[in-house]
C-alpha cells in the first residue's frame, strides 16, 4: 500500500443495476484504491439528472478527486463546473471522450467508440455480411450511438434498432420482432454482454439465420465466443478504465502528474474471437475481463 496520506476519490458512473460490465470497472477501481491508500466512494445512476446530483454530493463531501462517466455530457456540465470551481481534479472514463476536456477532465480512459465500431464493421465486411442490425439499448448515449455509426461507416446496409436495456424481456421481444420482419438481416450486434446474450434467444425464437456479434465482455459471453455461438466481441477492457481512473487521480495528488499529456488513454478496442477467447475466458472467470 502506498505510503501517501489517505485520500478520498469519488467514482460516479451511469451504470444501470445488474449490468456485469460495471462489476469489472469497479474491481479495477477497488484494486487501484487498495494499492494507493484511497477511500473509494463508488456511486452510479443511469438517470442523467441523478448522476449530476451524485457529482454535487461528491463536491460537498470535499473529495480529493472525481472519476466520472460522461454518457450524457450536457446534463453533467453544471455539476462538473462546481467540481472544477472547487479545485477538485477530474478524470473521465468509459463514455464521453469528445466532451472530456471541455468539461474539465485532464484525461479520459476508454475506447474510442467510433474506431471500435469501425473495427467491428471491417471484420463483418471481411466476413461478407451486408445487413447488420445494430442494437442500441440506451437512446441518446453518445458512446453507443458512435459504435453503431462506426459499424455503418464500414457496412452501409447497417440498420439501428433501439431497445429498452433496462427491461430484458422487452429487449428480447423487440429484437425477435425485428428479425422476423427483416429476413435479410444477416448479423445482429449487441452493444453489451447482457444484451448480446439476450439477442441469442431472439435469433432462436425468430427462427432467424442471422449470426450474432458483440461489444464488451463477461465470462458467459467469452464462453459463447469460445463455443462459436457469438462470432466475436470487442473488449474495451473496463477493468483498466476503473483502475486507470483512480490511479491517475492518485498520481495527480502525489506529484501533480497528469497522465495522458492532454490526450485520452485508450483501453481498447481489443478484438476477442475464437483465436484468443479461451485465454481471455481465464481472466473473465476472475471477473477482470
Language-model features, listed with the residues they occupy:
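Flexible loop/hinge segments that line or gate small-molecule binding clefts
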Residues: 74-115, 218-231, 281
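Extracytoplasmic "Venus flytrap"
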Residues: 7-32, 36, 41-53, 57, ...
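Short, solvent-exposed amphipathic alpha-helices that sit
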Residues: 20-36, 116-120, 142-158, 174, ...
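Short, low-complexity disordered leader/linker segments with a strong preference
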Residues: 1-8, 81-88, 289
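Hydrophobic alpha-helical
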Residues: 52, 68-84, 151, 165-223
Amino acid at each position: 500500500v502506498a505510503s501517501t496520506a489517505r485520500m478520498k476519490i469519488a467514482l460516479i458512473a451511469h451504470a444501470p443495476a445488474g449490468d456485469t460490465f460495471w462489476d469489472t470497472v469497479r474491481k479495477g477501481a477497488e484494486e487501484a484504491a487498495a494499492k494507493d491508500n484511497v477511500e473509494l466512494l463508488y456511486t452510479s445512476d443511469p438517470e442523467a439528472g441523478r448522476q449530476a446530483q451524485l457529482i454535487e454530493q461528491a463536491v460537498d463531501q470535499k473529495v480529493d478527486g472525481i472519476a466520472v462517466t460522461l454518457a450524457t455530457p450536457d446534463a453533467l456540465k453544471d455539476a462538473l463546473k462546481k467540481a472544477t470551481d472547487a479545485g477538485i481534479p477530474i478524470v473521465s472514463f468509459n463514455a464521453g471522450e469528445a466532451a472530456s476536456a471541455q468539461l474539465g477532465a485532464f484525461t479520459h480512459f476508454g475506447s474510442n467508440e467510433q474506431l471500435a465500431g469501425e473495427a467491428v464493421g471491417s471484420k463483418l465486411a471481411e466476413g461478407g455480411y451486408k445487413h447488420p442490425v445494430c442494437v442500441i439499448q440506451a437512446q441518446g448515449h453518445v458512446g453507443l450511438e458512435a459504435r453503431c455509426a462506426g459499424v455503418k461507416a464500414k457496412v452501409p446496409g447497417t440498420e439501428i434498432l433501439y431497445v429498452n436495456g433496462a427491461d430484458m424481456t422487452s429487449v428480447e421481444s423487440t429484437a425477435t420482432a425485428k428479425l422476423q420482419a427483416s429476413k435479410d438481416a444477416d448479423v445482429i450486434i449487441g452493444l453489451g454482454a447482457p444484451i448480446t446474450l439476450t439477442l441469442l434467444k431472439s435469433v432462436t425464437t425468430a427462427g432467424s439465420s442471422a449470426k450474432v456479434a458483440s461489444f464488451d465482455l463477461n465470462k458467459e459471453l467469452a464462453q459463447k465466443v469460445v463455443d462459436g455461438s457469438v462470432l466475436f466481441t470487442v473488449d474495451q477492457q473496463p477493468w483498466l478504465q476503473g483502475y486507470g481512473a483512480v490511479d491517475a487521480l492518485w498520481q495527480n495528488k502525489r506529484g501533480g502528474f497528469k497522465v495522458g499529456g492532454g490526450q485520452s488513454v485508450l483501453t481498447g478496442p481489443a478484438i476477442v474471437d475464437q483465436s484468443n477467447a479461451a485465454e481471455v475466458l481465464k481472466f473473465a472467470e476472475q471477473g477482470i475481463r
